[in-house]
Amino acid sequence: MELPIEDVRVRKVLDSRGNFTVEADVYIPGGFGRTSAPAGASTGETEVIAFSKKGIDESIKFFETNVRRSIIGFNALDQKGFDALITDLDGSGNFSNLGGNLSTALSMSVAKAVSAHLGIPLYRYVGGINHSMPRPIGNVIGGGKHARNGTSIQEFLVSAQGKTFMESAYVNVLVHRKIGDILSEKMKDISIGVGDERAWSVNISDEEAFEVLNQAVNEVSSETKVKIYTGLDFAADSLYENGKYVYKHTVRSRDEQIDYAISINKDFGVYYIEDPMFDTDFEGFAEITKKIGDKAMIVGDDLYTTNPDRIRKGIELGSTNAVLIKVNQIGTLTKAQEAASLASSAGLKNVVSHRSGETTDDFLAHLSVAFSSTFVKTGTIGGERIAKLNELMRIEECLTS
């Protein structure tokens, strides 16, 4: 059986920050797929290139000139072959011609078109019968590159462990609201805003943020009788300068940063710890994982950039016990699925994640189920974040009915 690609259209659309990104439409007999790609602010050095160095228009021009003709007629059932083809047509090794965002939109749209033709959900087409619901984890206090005048640490996260996905997502929202109330009461003379991911942004220290977070979590957990995990995304690359980790009010050496990450779990009970070290320090990650990996999830994002080769190195060194998955870090569904499978085969958990510049596309909701992710990281509020959470509620309904 073959399902030849009949037509492909690409266009510019706006993301949640009001920046241009790309959207791709793929048409096959009896099927149609559309995907808009997100964009990150905190990006890893080894990610594929989002767009041509000459800009998004140049990436679209490259597609029209060098890619379109070759993919028309290609069998959409051959996802691996399609992804290999657009990788070869790009020719750069890092999608610096076509752009990783456009390759992501094309790759995901092919999968969506086939799932539509077959009349099955995307999560089932990608994951088969091996799928499970993730828990939502979302940013409630933000800083770093996601917010001006915020905390040094980029994300303070919560993950409610409710009986259902819906309950968990809503309890996360309640924590977000509670934090807003606490900040308004305690910080009457300080401006309070929201960052790219709709987390609260306020000019306070990381230690003050911990106090607010823990107060909100304890109060909401007591009110709802739901256990709530806390988490951090250090985004340590944005703190790293000349071998040191530079915070607003202190500077830490490599060893001090390792000790600090360990103390976060021991002193504050933080369960989820993402990117605590610079993205080349596999050994530093491993020291943290060795000390607290039995009590916490140590997650590699910028460390791995969804790259199977880097994940293999992390597995060999015992760097982390979890991997973050972002399709547009690696550029194709095939490579993202390989990354998730590689992690799982080595006993590592995976977390499918949004980007700070999101769209209302919900493909990552389906991938988090298809990849049997422990968590799906997609914020707590905001239309582009809620789109994923609502889709996961629909999927949960299908899986439990």
Curated annotation (Swiss-Prot):
InterPro entries: Enolase, Enolase-like_C_sf, Enolase-like_N, Enolase_C, Enolase_CS, Enolase_N. One of its GO terms (cellular component) is cell surface. Binds a second Mg(2+) ion via substrate during catalysis. The active site is at E197, K326. Mg(2+) binds at D233, E274, D301. Pathway: Carbohydrate degradation; glycolysis; pyruvate from D-glyceraldehyde 3-phosphate: step 4/5. It is found in: Cytoplasm; Secreted; Cell surface. Its EC number is 4.2.1.11. GO terms for molecular function: magnesium ion binding; phosphopyruvate hydratase activity. Its main location: cytoplasm. This is Enolase. It comes from Thermoplasma volcanium (strain ATCC 51530 / DSM 4299 / JCM 9571 / NBRC 15438 / GSS1).
